[in-house]
Regions:
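Active-site region of the double-stranded beta-helix
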Residues: 1-90, 107-112, 118-157
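A structural signal for short, well-ordered beta-strand segments and their strand-loop junctions
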Residues: 96-97, 114-116
């Protein structure tokens, strides 16, 4: 079984040029809208060009693309295969990123919009959960990025 999981949507109804989706995430108690207006990396590389990641200690992410495409890099030392690259579009469903997973996302030149239907745990503080972590300062993270072949997932497979 893969370490990568998705929360799929349900189509209520389709008409010409319109699709009605149920995108409920029962676990969610928060919602964030993340807009990349053009080519973007979040978090951006650090001052020396090293990749940076977010890691939430008190939040699981359920990232769902609503417009465009977004690519996520995920690193979790507790997984059998610790390095994954996941390509998402609107049909993929919500990518579940469990707490304590290092992650970053990239959009192409046209940008993308993601809704994160997050599950926040007691102790969550926005000022502490969104601090970029550079792989230049985390030796084990740098080692995984350099030595592990990423498992690549495309469009919610």
């Amino acid at each position: 079984m893969s370490d990568i999981h998705f929360k799929k949507h349900r189509v209520f109804r389709e008409t010409e040029d319109v699709i009605f989706y149920d995108i409920s995430v029962d676990e969610s108690n928060a919602a964030d809208l993340v807009v990349h207006t053009g080519a973007a990396i979040s978090p951006p590389n650090d001052a020396v060009g090293a990749k940076q990641f977010y890691k939430h200690e008190f939040q699981d992410d359920y990232n769902r693309v609503v417009q465009g495409c977004r690519t996520f890099e995920l690193v979790n030392g507790n997984w059998k295969y610790p390095y994954h690259i996941v390509h998402l579009n609107r049909a993929s469903g919500a990518l579940i990123i469990p707490k304590n997973t290092y992650h970053r996302s990239t959009s192409g030149k046209d940008g993308s919009i993601v809704i994160n239907q997050a599950k926040r745990y007691a102790g969550f503080q926005a000022s502490e959960e969104f601090i970029p972590i550079s792989c230049a300062e985390q030796h084990w993270l740098y080692k995984i990025l350099m030595n592990e072949k990423p498992v690549i997932h495309t469009l919610g497979e």
